[in-house]
Amino acid sequence: MRFPHVSDDNPFKVLSPGVESDVLCILGRSPMEHSASNIADLTDRSRSQVHMVLQRLVQTELVLRCVLEGWSGYRLNPQHPLTEHVKAIAQLRITRSTEGA
């Protein structure tokens, strides 16, 4: 079975094509903390867009915010029940087949 709408670059886009999918994909693929600026650079989104999404995800407790020497870092909350699912979606790779194309 083929799923042409599922992107290997960002499988979350099939659920949400917006900034949320970009942020979740970055956080789901990385064990380290990222700043809003770093995520914005990696996704070609504005820092303010990314920051708004991160604030909402922190409120839901899916994402943790860590402050170190004036620098805010964000990462998935390992205790949240959706974290492993977010990681699994972020790591998803669809095998592309030319069969039947």
Feature roles, as predicted:
Residues 67-73, 77-79:
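Short, Lys/Arg-rich nucleic-acid/phosphate-binding segment
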Residues 45-58:
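Short amphipathic alpha-helical interaction segments
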Residues 77-101:
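Conserved segment of winged-helix/HTH DNA-binding domains
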Residues 1-22:
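Short alpha-helical segments that sit at the start of domains
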Residues 14, 27-31:
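Short helix-capping/hinge SLiMs at alpha-helix to coil transitions
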